[in-house]
Design a protein with these regions (language model features):
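Metal-dependent nuclease catalytic regions and adjoining charged, substrate-binding loops involved
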Residues: 1, 171-176, 189-263
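Metal-dependent nuclease catalytic cores that hydrolyze phosphodiester bonds in DNA/RNA
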Residues: 1-158, 165
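Short acidic (Asp/Glu) and glycine-rich catalytic loops that position anionic groups and cofactors
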Residues: 68-71, 163, 202-207
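Soluble or luminal CAZymes and related metallo-dependent hydrolases
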Residues: 84-88, 178, 221
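Short, glycine/acidic-rich beta->alpha junctions
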Residues: 140-141, 175-179
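Short beta-strand-loop-alpha-helix junction that forms the active-site gateway
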Residues: 161-174
Length: 263
């Protein structure tokens, strides 16, 4: 009986869809196509540390040992938000590159050139996509995308672009604490102390900038974080869930199911 009822529901859905006007039918297909393309592009994360995901040692542990993330499907709106963020990154990077042509004392530095000139042998250039460079730190087993390096008024800075909604942007007073470890990881990789954050409202495209200075203590703490996680990996024991981890870190975590099992 239950099976027949379910078949009837599917028939009803098909019937309704067949009765839709072509413009609505097209829109539904467009939305679904966006989601299907995103699902096809989903891949298992590499077994490396990611600077943007180093706010929970247990999360890092699961990634390093290759635990399959929770299955999830992004809505077409979320896919659009991510794509919009990528587009904004490209436009801002291009605008920064054009500053020199407009007579300003600012130069957008090619990351691969910077790595070679500074003889940063631990860094491997994995790929380049436009103005973004994907790198791998061999000693730390860390992979990341870099928005860029600039030389502004004679000093080098790591450039990090962040897009956010208008509510977060309006209340933005400083660098988000969840981005501290990411900035520290970049500093450790490039040997530069200062990370220039530019936060962009994805709604009205206004911008705010903040400087984050990385200290030797911060870099040492991050190296200790990696070393501690590596020891858990070697012993095949999941680290305790940090008590200080922020709620949003848990909310956006891709390993919630496994984390609950490990208690």
């Amino acid at each position: 009986v239950a099976r027949n009822s379910l078949k009837n529901v599917f028939r009803l859905i098909d019937s309704v869809q067949n009765q839709l006007p072509p413009e609505q039918d097209f829109l539904n297909d467009l939305k679904r196509s966006i989601e299907m393309t995103d699902e096809k592009n989903n891949r298992l994360p590499s077994k490396t540390y990611k600077p943007s995901g180093m706010n929970c040692i247990r999360q890092s542990y699961y990634q390093i040992i290759g635990i399959e993330p929770d299955k999830s499907s992004s809505s077409y709106t979320l896919v659009g938000i991510c794509n919009s963020g990528t587009d904004i990154h490209i436009r801002i990077q291009t605008a920064v590159e054009q500053m020199k042509d407009n007579g300003m004392d600012c130069e957008y530095i090619d990351v691969s050139t910077f790595v070679n000139q500074r003889n940063l042998t631990d860094l491997e250039i994995v790929s380049k996509n436009g103005m973004e460079t994907k790198l791998y730190h061999k000693k730390l087993n860390m992979s990341f995308m870099c928005d860029g390096i600039i030389r502004y008024k004679g000093k080098y800075y790591i450039l990090e672009l962040k897009t956010e909604n208008s509510y977060k942007f309006m209340n933005r007073k400083d660098v988000d604490p969840s981005h501290y470890n990411q900035a520290t990881a970049y500093s450790l990789a490039f040997g530069l102390d200062d990370v220039l954050f530019v936060y962009i409202s994805r709604d009205v495209l206004d911008m705010k900038s903040f400087m984050f200075h990385v200290t030797d203590e911060m870099r040492e703490n991050l190296k200790n974080y990696i070393s501690e996680c590596d020891s858990y990996v070697s012993n095949k024991i999941a680290p305790p869930k940090p008590e200080s981890v922020e709620r949003k870190t848990c909310n956006y975590c891709n390993y919630k199911s496994r984390c609950k099992k490990d208690k």
